[in-house]
Amino acid sequence: MDYDYEKLGLKVGLEIHQQLNTKRKLFCNCPTKIRDDEPHGEIERFLRPSQSEMGQVDKAAILESRKEKKFIYQYYNDTTCLVELDDEPPHNVSEEGLNTALEVSTLMNMNFADEIHVMRKMVIDGSNTSGFQRTMFVSQDGFIETEYGKIRITSLCLEEDSCKKVEDGRDYTKYCVDRLGIPLLEITTEPDITSPKMGKEAARRIGTILRATGKVKRGLGTIRQDVNISIKNGARIEVKGVQNLDLIEKIIENEVTRQVSLNNLKEELIGRNAEVLDEIIDVTELLNDTESKVLRGALKNKGVIKAILLKGFSGLIGKEVQPGRRLGTEFSDRGKVLGGVGGLFHTDELPKYGITDEEVNKLKKFMNCGENDAVILVADAKNKAERALLAVIERAKESLIGIPEETRKALDDGNTSYLRPLPGAARMYPETDVPKILITSEICERIKNNLPEMPEEKTIRFIKEYELNEDLAKQMVMSYNVELFENLSKKYPNIKPTLIATTLEATLKEIKREGLDTEVLTDEHLNELFLGLSEDKMSKEAIPEVIKGYINNPNMKLDEVLDVAGLSKMSKEEVEAVILDIINQNILIVNEKGMGATGLLMGRCMAQLRGKADGKLINVTLQNKLKEKVQGQ
């Protein structure tokens, strides 16, 4: 839907979280390596909220503790340590991580803090073993320029990343601590963004600055965007975990649709004199003989069926508020998160779940349900069902007032779902185990004098210096392999930089699409490959097969890969002999077509010689030998 975003008073702010590609973690010497092999062990914990320095307890922390979830943490003996498991004090802050934070701050025109103090930010969703995240305020009051105008940068913080979620059960969550402690930059903008397109452009520009440092991780999950969205007569909504830049625009559009729809529903509910009753009624006996598989499943597990009455809500619970999501989905999300139930049912949709019309009418009569009223059911264990319905009652009451402020989770389709209330300010307190860091004038000067080349400047240089076309230059500048490209181009001047760039960007992607793990390749492999090419040990046509050889046999040297694959480069004389043999085998075609047989013969030559000789040499040799044969007839 097209909206007048200015008239709606749309305001959007971003929080960008970017992992840094440092040698060690922020507070220990473990590598910043994410693993997917079998962990070496597990520990279990329960986390509980505690008071801040001001004697307050954060409401989001209280909510999480009500879930009574057990947290399981996987670890590795060789790449994680006791710091991640919260059994050893943190070490000093990673100097590499801090320098990168200061560098990015400078590129965004920010003012450094004179002293950097490590703080503890309370987290009780289990994603930190300690129940808090260590974070430090580095800089403030900056700005970036975009094609839509200037966007102010509020702050930049350096913090530790959280654990990686492995599994989420009803009563437990399993994490791996390999990600915990990886240095993470948190960049927060002011709510200066006034359209979905501007939101996407702001995130793209910040991402460009981050990649310019050459010190950030790449790939899915290494950058996460949180988007704060509000409109007039709406509420501030924090959308967590947008991993795809292209999704930001759609997330903003759909959240605007959601808030506009919820405001319209509020007006309709008020017009109906809608009311939410607090009473939770047990209807287990009433529906004890139902044939509904969903309800019977709960009853077989010694569950109960509980119900609430929403006066004036009939026909509105099924109203769409986002593409494919309804007001009932909003209620269901609350019940799932706060009650731990699988879902809920309402009278507008009950026949879909195998509940008969007769049972629906009986239920409505039992609940004193009027024509405009609706009933919501939950079938589960007694305590879960009651917790879920209490959450639904609260959310239904909020729908009569307006839009609740909350934190929502980004979904892959551009929609969002309820996660938790917006956190309060009572979740931060000082870290006493790490000393403060002074940012001296010498440090500031060193950072300013060693700033990286910005992508726009580097693109122009690549076009001039390496003779790349504009598209390839832009692609190479934004590549994780940009430093490797420059090193190889300077080391092997007899190889065209275009070939090196194409190999690093296009060839590797093509091989990855074939299902091969290109992560196995090291810089040493690629260096050896181009060394072999520069020494005429192989042809450029052999590059894809050599790379595949390295992937399948990472410990092999180039000569071994070439030998196994039969790709050792032929001499000119050997190429001539093969081509003459092919011409003689197809002499009848040559006699009939003369030079017109070139295309057919070239295909047969390449079938035998591809990867063993340069295509140009094969083509020239074939032309010459074929001409000799034709003229000699």
UniProtKB/Swiss-Prot annotation:
Keywords: ATP-binding, Ligase, Nucleotide-binding, Protein biosynthesis. Its EC number is 6.3.5.-. The gene is gatE. This is Glutamyl-tRNA(Gln) amidotransferase subunit E. Allows the formation of correctly charged Gln-tRNA(Gln) through the transamidation of misacylated Glu-tRNA(Gln) in organisms which lack glutaminyl-tRNA synthetase. The reaction takes place in the presence of glutamine and ATP through an activated gamma-phospho-Glu-tRNA(Gln). The GatDE system is specific for glutamate and does not act on aspartate. One of its GO terms (molecular function) is ATP binding. GO terms for biological process: glutaminyl-tRNAGln biosynthesis via transamidation; translation. PROSITE patterns: GATB. Belongs to the GatB/GatE family. GatE subfamily. It comes from the Archaea. It comes from Methanococcus vannielii (strain ATCC 35089 / DSM 1224 / JCM 13029 / OCM 148 / SB). InterPro entries: Asn/Gln-tRNA_amidoTrfase_suB/E (IPR017959), Asn/Gln-tRNA_Trfase_suB/E_cat (IPR006075), Asn/Gln_amidotransferase (IPR018027), Asn/Gln_tRNA_amidoTrase-B-like (IPR003789), GAD-like_sf (IPR004115), GAD_dom (IPR029351), GatB_C_1 (IPR042114), GatB_Yqey_C_2 (IPR023168). Transmembrane segments: none annotated. It holds the Pfam family GatB_Yqey. SUPFAM superfamilies: GAD domain-like, GatB/YqeY motif, Glutamine synthetase/guanido kinase. Heterodimer of GatD and GatE. HAMAP family: GatE. It catalyses: L-glutamyl-tRNA(Gln) + L-glutamine + ATP + H2O = L-glutaminyl-tRNA(Gln) + L-glutamate + ADP + phosphate + H(+). One of its GO terms (cellular component) is cytoplasm.
